[in-house]
UniProtKB/Swiss-Prot annotation:
EC number per UniProt: 5.4.99.12
Full protein name: tRNA pseudouridine synthase A
Function: Formation of pseudouridine at positions 38, 39 and 40 in the anticodon stem and loop of transfer RNAs.
Organism field: Burkholderia mallei (strain ATCC 23344)
InterPro entries membership: PsdUridine_synth_cat_dom_sf (IPR020103), PsdUridine_synth_TruA (IPR001406), PsdUridine_synth_TruA_a/b_dom (IPR020097), PsdUridine_synth_TruA_C (IPR020095), TruA/RsuA/RluB/E/F_N (IPR020094)
UniProt-annotated binding residues for substrate: 109
Catalytic residues identified in the record: 51 (nucleophile)
Catalytic activity: uridine(38/39/40) in tRNA = pseudouridine(38/39/40) in tRNA
The keyword Transmembrane helix appears for this protein: no
Organism phylogeny: Bacteria, Pseudomonadati, Pseudomonadota, Betaproteobacteria, Burkholderiales
Family: Belongs to the tRNA pseudouridine synthase TruA family.
Entry's Gene Ontology molecular function annotations: RNA binding; tRNA pseudouridine(38-40) synthase activity
Pfam family for this entry, one: PseudoU_synth_1
Transmembrane segments: none
A Gene Ontology BP annotation from the UniProt entry: tRNA pseudouridine synthesis
Length: 270
């Protein structure tokens, strides 16, 4: 039997998703808790491996098991052994054709950026921060050069293991909201550090360091050295993983973050 789980976690509490020898990752915490509840080892496969500091709101995993448990039993039982920084949101039996990673056809990330002369300790680990105003119109113009199917080699990390750098970026939405600017990135898939590298470039344009057309030059170069430094992870959230309707994957619970209404309004906007 294949079981899918919807997971939320505070990325600031972990050294990324993927299991490590030190055991301080989201995958390690989840698999330890599943083992406690199921009294057997269960290996999880994830939709997207997030980095240290990156949060999960709509993360999806699957595992195979011979155990027959009620759906909510998996939720309640696993959560009983998880730390407060991780929670299973839902559980659902799936056909063998479902795969958390390979069945997904799109991913959506949001970035919450605090723009203020002084950093806020209340936002530590929850939002990125810049101390100077940003030109939103310039960032929107720059983002328009990136939408579409492109070779995103200039925005991938040296550790990226993806077979192809070609991805289809469907949307970059940018919306100011008081002292915040919110970004929405939606694509069929992302390269390692791709969103944070895109953020670094957009912020550089917003600060006036480069014209909006610079992003087209960076994209065309396919050279990571031509782009801006990788931006901080703290404000980045994996919010949604899209699957074919036949799997009826439950939607992510975005209401758990204070900016959910702003993010909802970003849908379809640029």
């Amino acid at each position: 039997m294949r079981i899918a789980l919807g997971i939320q976690y505070d990325g600031a509490a972990f050294c990324g998703w993927q299991s490590q020898p030190h055991g301080k990752t989201v995958q390690d915490a989840l698999e330890r808790s599943l083992a406690e509840f199921a009294q057997t080892s269960l290996h999880t496969t994830v939709a997207g491996r997030t980095d240290t500091g990156v949060h999960g709101l709509g993360q999806v995993v699957h595992f195979d098991t011979d155990l027959d448990r009620a759906d909510f039993s998996w939720v309640r039982g696993t959560n009983a052994f998880l730390p407060p920084t991780v929670a299973v949101q839902w559980a659902k039996p799936m056909p063998d054709t479902f795969h958390a990673r390979f069945a997904a056809f799109e991913r959506t990330y949001y970035y919450a950026l605090y723009v203020h002369p002084v950093r806020s300790p209340m936002l530590a680990g929850r939002a990125g921060w810049v101390h100077t105003p940003l030109d939103v119109d310039a960032m929107r113009e720059a983002a328009a050069h990136l939408v579409g199917e492109h070779d995103f080699s200039a925005f991938r990390s040296s550790e990226c293991q993806a077979k192809s750098p070609v991805k289809h970026l469907y949307q970059i939405g940018i919306r100011p909201d008081g002292d915040f600017i919110h970004f929405r990135f939606r694509a069929n898939a992302f390269l390692h550090h791709m969103v944070r590298n895109l953020m670094g470039c957009l912020v550089a344009v917003g600060r006036g360091r480069y014209p909006s057309s610079w992003l087209a030059e960076v994209l065309e170069s396919r050279d990571r050295d031509c782009a801006a430094p990788t931006f901080m992870p703290e404000g980045l959230y994996l919010a949604h993983v899209g699957y074919p309707a036949e799997f009826a994957v439950p939607p992510a619970q975005l209401g758990s973050v204070p900016w959910s209404s702003v993010w909802a309004d970003l849908d379809g906007r640029t």
